[in-house]
């Protein structure tokens, strides 16, 4: 029997506001334990939450970016549960009226086909703290994360393969990152994914019993965990077994999923409206203000790069992977840079440098104007492509004018025959053995002189001019 895979994803995105959702404490990552807390985060008696307007702004932007309807009368609810990292014994979230609902995004699969994935809802809530279990037998609570604003984005169960789930997460991350509401860094916990997966026989309308997957700390692990579950559940069903409603975690060591707990039924969180927060009215003026702040998104940019600038689909995808890189590219082209040349540099030397340094493009000193100027002096013969790599590293570290640096550092390409011919003759004198090989007709002996000449000029000889002059002077040796 063959089975159809049914997948839905729940994605928590940490919003990059300066302060928390209901308290003035800093929301920044990486501080000493409990440094970013106050009496609201610790839930002291009598303290009251105050909404951070920037969180609602971010929620509106997310809803618009995900093609969602917006609840114009929005409220918060209490989700009741007890856990040590939750001192109030409830979480302030949204239940029946989330800020966004009925959305969708398009995804592109590896074969180039596209599919629309519906999004059920996007709701605002506060994050919980973090428990740490020490080797001394004690457990410790860090409330730095308590109250950090989140938006949870819940898809419909529209994905039919792990590949589609991976494509959905990739597209969702791009869109959220472009809005500027989050840096969506999974390694820092600002994007977290839970997956729900079930199988059903083809043709059956009812969903099968779902399994929830946790501990998915990368898109790759989401895909691997789902692929494992497809095989595991199919094997159970084909052998006549029954799938239990479980929560499982992905284990990187075994490349499989491990049972965490069996769910007997849906949890009852006893939601009710948060009495300490008012109803918030989101009018059309507010919505349009947020819409005006949104950028052009990756799909539209890719279409422009392909249709108007003549780039390949691959190049367009690479350039739009982050908003910072896409913005850099567009500014460089607007300054007169050739789109293909700019693209080649950004995907080549620039990308290699950023990876080696562990930095984003906005964190180095290279500017679009610097890059365009450097490409220009390559084109006019001032420097060679080889020297340009050295110039680029200088610009990445120090900025400034490419032409001024080249002139100051003595890196201008040598194209004058009156300068190059004497150097060629000196090379002949120094490389007597190579000259003998050449005269005797030894195969490829002439090619060695190119390397000798480039070494003698410290790489500054114009390659095209050098080749012509070398051929000319070598021929004279045979005459």
Curated annotation (Swiss-Prot):
Q: Provide the alphabetized UniProt keywords.
A: ATP-binding, Ligase, Nucleotide-binding, Protein biosynthesis
Highest taxon of source: Bacteria
Pfam families given in the database record? GatB_N (PF02934), GatB_Yqey (PF02637)
* Reaction(s) this enzyme catalyzes, per UniProt: L-glutamyl-tRNA(Gln) + L-glutamine + ATP + H2O = L-glutaminyl-tRNA(Gln) + L-glutamate + ADP + phosphate + H(+); L-aspartyl-tRNA(Asn) + L-glutamine + ATP + H2O = L-asparaginyl-tRNA(Asn) + L-glutamate + ADP + phosphate + 2 H(+)
- EC code(s) of this entry: 6.3.5.-
Q: Which HAMAP family match?
A: GatB
A molecular function (GO) held by this record is: ATP binding
- GO annotation terms (biological process): glutaminyl-tRNAGln biosynthesis via transamidation; translation
Q: What does this protein do?
A: Allows the formation of correctly charged Asn-tRNA(Asn) or Gln-tRNA(Gln) through the transamidation of misacylated Asp-tRNA(Asn) or Glu-tRNA(Gln) in organisms which lack either or both of asparaginyl-tRNA or glutaminyl-tRNA synthetases. The reaction takes place in the presence of glutamine and ATP through an activated phospho-Asp-tRNA(Asn) or phospho-Glu-tRNA(Gln).
Subunit and partners: Heterotrimer of A, B and C subunits.
Q: Under which name does UniProt file this protein?
A: Aspartyl/glutamyl-tRNA(Asn/Gln) amidotransferase subunit B
Report the sequence similarity comment from the record: Belongs to the GatB/GatE family. GatB subfamily.
Q: PANTHER family, from UniProt?
A: GLUTAMYL-TRNA GLN AMIDOTRANSFERASE SUBUNIT B MITOCHONDRIAL AND PROKARYOTIC PET112-RELATED, GLUTAMYL-TRNA(GLN) AMIDOTRANSFERASE SUBUNIT B, MITOCHONDRIAL
